[in-house]
Design a protein with these regions (language model features):
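Short, glycine/acidic-enriched capping/hinge loops at junctions between secondary-structure elements
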Residues: 38-40
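Intrinsically disordered, low-complexity segments enriched in small/polar residues
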Residues: 1-4, 68
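Active-site-proximal helix/loop segments of hydrolytic enzymes
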Residues: 18-26, 34, 43, 47-149
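Sec-dependent N-terminal signal peptides
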Residues: 3-14
Length: 149
């Protein structure tokens, strides 16, 4: 049932109540902060992904029965290091960590969706188990939703 949440979010179906996420929590990390990763023409990845993260948090609370949504930063004035983000997510014990980035390239023909999950050196999944399975499921939906490819 939790896969339905991503389906509704990516395809933009509004006012649909997604159930089955009760007992779940999510950590949203709008990657970078402040002036990090400034693009050409003054594009700020940090500002753009913050808006996406805040909107995602609003959608999750208003259109699902998810218990808790954590977010690593809530405004452009916060400077949050990678260590602080991961430490916060690990401290609260979130079920899912979702880091949002909008990587860019000077090659306009390059469009990609990147999904990462934890894996130990011996090849076993990094707890909580399920990241690879979720990423395998999500990659096509995210790519289609962002109209990449």
């Amino acid at each position: 049932m939790r896969y339905l949440l991503y389906f509704f979010l990516i395809l933009g179906i509004h006012n649909a109540q997604v159930t089955g996420l009760n007992g779940w929590d999510l950590f949203i990390d709008p990657g970078h902060s402040q002036d990090e990763n400034m693009g050409i023409n003054g594009y700020s990845e940090a500002k753009e992904v913050l808006q996406v993260g805040l909107e995602l948090m609003d959608i999750l609370y208003s259109q699902s029965d998810i218990d808790t949504v954590y977010i690593s930063r809530t405004n452009d004035n916060q400077s949050v290091s990678l260590y602080q983000r991961t430490n916060y997510a690990n401290t609260v014990g979130a079920s899912w960590f979702h880091s949002i980035h909008s990587d860019a390239s000077s090659n306009t023909n390059t469009n990609r969706t990147l999904m990462l999950w934890g894996q130990r050196n011996n090849g076993n999944p990094d707890p909580p188990v399920g990241g690879e399975e979720m990423s395998s499921f999500m990659i096509d939906i995210l790519t289609q939703g962002m109209r990449i490819g």
